[in-house]
């Protein structure tokens, strides 16, 4: 049985850890609110861009564009979005597990790592990292997403990538983050027919010109939304993990305190027994 001194030292250590995890939970909760607001603001815009893209593509009469061009697939690129840090439960592990299952059977996949965890994971497993974007900060900027999108667009247009996929964690709620894969390039335009009266649009200077401007914006917006979803999921997972760690620390403190009380009681009982034994010996 541990001594009272050892138990006091352990209780002090666990209390110190509990204070840290509690503070991290509060910080994650504050960041989560901001990240969640950003996701909720970005989703309608991304959906509207997709809707407009489908209308313009239909109006253009099947106009050709490099970002719509499907060709023989030789090189597949994966933009894999993770966090830069850990302490967020299984958030990173779930994304990396999904990404690993996607690239496992692909010959020489091009890895575009967004986040330190993504870069380090695939580097350790011998994959060549085509590009990495790490330490992007807590507040994701559109300029960061635009840089990543422009990189894969240039590679796709140059013929170095034949397909590009996004692998990230879609934010469902605080407790649920769902790893998903989304095809980014070539851009797939929805062809489903709308019900009800249709609105006829006039495009200036032409539907083809609007499409040429809209396609890169659509790719940039899709990457931006994925990064925002991943950031919200990271903070939600971290808040949940730190809340669980704080509760576990409390339970451990209670157990250690009980052990300390028992150790004290045993020591007192032993002292009383020694006193009684000594008194009996003097009689």
Swiss-Prot record:
Protein's UniProt keywords contain Metal-binding: no
MF annotations from Gene Ontology: ATP binding; proton-transporting ATP synthase activity, rotational mechanism
Keywords, sorted A to Z: ATP synthesis, Cell membrane, CF(1), Hydrogen ion transport, Ion transport, Membrane, Transport
UniProt xrefs under InterPro entries: ATP_synth_F1_ATPase_gsu, ATP_synth_F1_gsu, ATP_synth_F1_gsu_CS
Gene Ontology BP terms: proton motive force-driven plasma membrane ATP synthesis
Gene3D superfamilies reported in the protein's UniProt record: 3.40.1380.10, ATP synthase, gamma subunit, helix hairpin domain (1.10.287.80)
Family assignment from sequence similarity: Belongs to the ATPase gamma chain family.
HAMAP family assigned: ATP_synth_gamma_bact
Protein name: ATP synthase gamma chain
Species lineage: Bacteria, Bacillati, Bacillota, Clostridia, Eubacteriales
